[in-house]
């Protein structure tokens, strides 16, 4: 089965994260066994991004959500290694500024969406406004509970204007999160990532789980689906995300635009330049 279907949250589904194994690796027998397949998808992703850029009629928005140490940065690094930075950008959404808070919660999001021909990757996204806002009571329930429908309407508008949306929840276990926190402590190159807030947020694990489940359940639509990616194994996470993006883009059946010049004339110019050495 194609991954674009296998890990997709069907619209109307009631998600239970405890029923989804974050350590799942499909049939793959470890990282080394999957290296060739991963590289094949990376190369194909590079080709498809060039085609998206040249085609110029559509854009692609990729939203990444995860709990702390879930692998958002690693996934972005893996994808960017496959793409031409000329047509790709990454936007991270942290605590809103005073200016952003003076607008509606989607204002800063809309400004960051991709132009036609571009790929934009959101490191966290508008879903923080139904996740952290809910868990930490940043706004009352009567406010955040209305945001699911507003998010769906917002994404529907983007799709109507030819922005295709893929949303990935990188699903890790609580044990794996703690292992990654330990790895950061042990690696001087990663110690800069350490924050006391990580451990504070970890204490809200049982509150984040239902918040994610409701967002995944209510906001996975036919036109803007969520994908739940088993992410305890970083290599499988990278494989699954790359494969889904490739399968999705291939389904768009994009084509290179026709040349805008007279090729016969250009060929004559070329042969003339070659003949005369200039």
Where are these regions (language model features)?
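Charged, amphipathic alpha-helical linker segments immediately N-terminal to NTP-binding catalytic cores
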Residues: 1-42
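Conserved nucleotide-sensing/catalytic segment adjacent to the nucleotide-binding pocket
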Residues: 28-37, 86-148
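Glycine-rich phosphate-binding P-loop
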Residues: 63-80
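Conserved nucleotide-binding/hydrolysis micro-motifs of P-loop NTPases
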Residues: 69, 96-99, 125-128, 137, ...
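Post-Walker A helix-loop "phosphate-sensing" segment adjacent to the P-loop in P-loop NTPases
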Residues: 81-90, 253
